């Protein structure tokens, strides 16, 4: 299918500022869009932490939060008020602040971060809810939600009901502060295959609701920090394991370089684990004294997250394509995103009716994933822009019998027909893609789909953008096409039959084909009454008849008398 000539580009043009893509909005609109997204995130955040209900997928929330920060930076706005962390409802102070973790974009960033750092370990980045556990005199004295990193809610009553969390400790852990992740226990969870399952939201919901004590049995704990604990990492891990926090030791590995980090990351992505993960965390064994820990200042650890299974992408334009059969398809052009190492910059929405039902306009944020064979797929619209500037689709008068001849309204279906006849299913013109057909048609103004047969080698060579080797190849392909059998030319004319049915018919000339009745076509493989009728309509179409006479004049096999 080819893109409609008068495709409607959206109002979002993009430029680079400090390495980020920024919408070219007027100041008033920028302020409005930022305020709307900020309020939506705040509402979702409030529902998530107060009611334990996720109104949106965790990954979508994270990506939209990052998009908000990007927009705010584009306009020079303070990002401190961005609601990416829980609202501060609790007032219980953490004995040691939660620093958070810096995110590294790729292996190169990992290599750079590791340079100059020593005694490094890697752990899975368990996807759950962060908590502080305070042990005093060998007993669990308090459990505090992460909150803003300095203070949070007192979760002690709920945490006491989680069987997997030790209620008493000994030795160095008798009086200790631990930081970790409360997670949903899984059996044989393979992250690459099963995804995130909204695990973080499920854990938050269990901890927030008041009527589900039994559900807490399914929660576990992964300790990732023991502030002021043993300086020796193996000793630290050993003591945690003896106290009942065994997962930390089991899933902590010494790493010397980015290659070892990458191997661990890939292994945990594809192996069966007892929890959901969203990447890995690299940390130095040597940490500063806890009195120096501050939110956002943990430079001794960093995370390398897994690429999301689905990406939030910005719609930059809505385009319409018309296939050779006349079907109109809507395509969304996107600000490019990367999915599984694939650069995605457009996604097929489907029919005009489906597009209207989706209500997608330039400026909207949509969730895109990869379907079978790596084809981009639209999953949902996650955010709609305030401004709803939609293009008008082309008239729907196209069908399987239109646009064999070029006209102003037929440009896209005409190009689609050229692409089809050059494909391996028809004449097999190697090297003739859409761009080549467009260049030839724009230069030489084809009258119909076979006008290229009349081109001379000089005309092809004088086509803008064609190098000498390219033009010579096209000339050879066009000459070879003249030797193709009759059935190939009929396929190029888009007869509504499969190749198998056409071969079974035994027709080797236009004269034979004209003599066939509808009853004959019905008896062919995969050809019923409806398709047989379409063959008759195709054969009797005036444009098809004219094309058959033109091919006869060109001495194409099967069309002469």
Swiss-Prot record:
The record ties this protein, via InterPro entries, to: DNA_ligase_AS (IPR018239), DNA_ligase_B (IPR020923), DNA_ligase_CS (IPR033136), DNAligase_adenylation (IPR013839), DNAligase_N (IPR013840), NA-bd_OB-fold (IPR012340), NAD_dep_DNA_ligaseB (IPR050326), NAD_DNA_ligase_OB (IPR004150)
Annotated catalytic residues? 125
What start-end ranges are recorded for coiled-coil regions in this protein? none
Q: What EC class does the entry list?
A: ligase
Protein function: Catalyzes the formation of phosphodiester linkages between 5'-phosphoryl and 3'-hydroxyl groups in double-stranded DNA using NAD as a coenzyme and as the energy source for the reaction.
Catalysed reaction(s)?
Answer: NAD(+) + (deoxyribonucleotide)n-3'-hydroxyl + 5'-phospho-(deoxyribonucleotide)m = (deoxyribonucleotide)n+m + AMP + beta-nicotinamide D-nucleotide
Respond yes or no to whether keyword Transmembrane is given for this record.
no
Gene from which the chain derives: ligB
Q: EC no.?
A: 6.5.1.2
In terms of PANTHER family, this protein maps to: DNA LIGASE, DNA LIGASE B
**Keyword line:** DNA damage, DNA repair, DNA replication, Ligase, NAD
GO biological process terms held by the UniProt record: DNA repair; DNA replication
Q: Please give the Gene Ontology molecular function terms for this protein.
A: DNA ligase (NAD+) activity
Q: What is the lineage of its organism?
A: Bacteria, Pseudomonadati, Pseudomonadota, Gammaproteobacteria, Enterobacterales
Q: Entry's PROSITE patterns?
A: DNA_LIGASE_N1, DNA_LIGASE_N2
| Family listed | Belongs to the NAD-dependent DNA ligase family. LigB subfamily.
Q: What is this protein called?
A: DNA ligase B
């Amino acid at each position: 299918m080819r893109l409609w000539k008068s495709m409607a580009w959206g109002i979002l043009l993009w430029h680079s500022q400090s390495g980020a893509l920024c919408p070219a909005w007027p100041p008033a609109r920028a302020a409005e869009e930022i305020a709307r997204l900020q309020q939506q995130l705040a509402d979702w955040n409030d529902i998530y932490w107060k009611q334990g209900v996720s109104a949106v997928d965790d990954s979508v929330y994270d990506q939209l939060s990052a998009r908000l920060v990007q927009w705010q930076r584009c306009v020079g706005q303070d990002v401190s008020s961005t609601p990416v962390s829980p609202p501060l409802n609790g007032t219980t102070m953490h004995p040691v602040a939660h620093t958070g973790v810096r995110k590294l974009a790729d292996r190169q960033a990992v290599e750079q971060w590791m340079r100059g750092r020593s005694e490094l370990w890697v752990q899975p980045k368990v996807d759950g809810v962060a908590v502080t556990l305070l042990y005093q005199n060998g007993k669990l004295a308090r459990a505090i939600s992460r909150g803003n990193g300095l203070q949070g809610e007192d979760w002690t009553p709920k945490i006491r009901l989680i069987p997997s969390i030790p209620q008493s400790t000994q030795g160095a852990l008798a009086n200790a502060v631990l930081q970790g992740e409360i997670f949903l226990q899984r059996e044989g969870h393979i992250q690459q295959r099963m995804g995130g399952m909204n695990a973080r939201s499920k854990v938050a919901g269990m901890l927030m609701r008041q009527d589900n004590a039994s559900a807490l049995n399914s929660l576990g704990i992964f300790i990732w920090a023991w502030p002021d604990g043993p300086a020796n990492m193996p000793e630290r891990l050993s003591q945690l394991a003896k106290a009942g926090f065994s997962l930390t030791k089991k899933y902590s590995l010494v790493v010397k370089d980015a290659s070892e980090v990458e191997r661990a990351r890939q292994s945990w992505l594809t192996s069966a684990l007892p929890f959901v993960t969203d990447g890995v965390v690299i940390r130095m064994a040597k940490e500063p004294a806890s009195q120096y820990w501050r939110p956002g200042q943990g430079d001794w650890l960093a995370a390398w997250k897994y690429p999301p299974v689905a990406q939030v992408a910005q719609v930059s334009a809505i385009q319409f394509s018309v296939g050779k059969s006349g079907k109109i398809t809507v395509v969304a052009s996107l600000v490019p995103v990367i999915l599984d190492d694939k650069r995605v910059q457009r996604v097929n929405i489907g029919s005009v009716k489906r597009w209207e039902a989706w209500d997608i306009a330039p400026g909207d944020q949509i969730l895109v994933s990869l379907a079978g064979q790596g084809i981009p797929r639209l999953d949902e619209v996650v955010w709609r822009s305030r401004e709803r500037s939609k293009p008008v689709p082309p008239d729907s008068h196209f069908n399987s019998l239109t646009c064999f001849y070029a006209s102003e309204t037929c440009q896209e279906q005409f190009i689609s027909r050229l692409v089809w006849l050059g494909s391996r299913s028809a004449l097999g013109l190697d090297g003739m893609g859409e761009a080549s057909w467009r260049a030839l048609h724009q230069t030489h103004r084809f009258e119909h789909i076979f006008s290229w047969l009349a081109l001379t080698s000089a005309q092809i060579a004088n086509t803008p953008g064609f190098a000498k080797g390219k033009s010579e190849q096209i000339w050879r392909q066009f000459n070879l096409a003249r030797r193709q059998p009759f059935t190939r030319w009929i396929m190029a004319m888009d007869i509504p039959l499969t190749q198998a049915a056409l071969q079974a018919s035994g027709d080797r000339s236009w004269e034979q084909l004209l003599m066939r009745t509808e009853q004959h076509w019905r008896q062919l493989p995969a050809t019923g009454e409806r398709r047989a009728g379409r063959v008759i309509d195709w054969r009797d179409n005036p444009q098809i008849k004219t094309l058959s006479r033109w091919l006869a004049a060109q001495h194409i096999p099967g069309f002469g008398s």
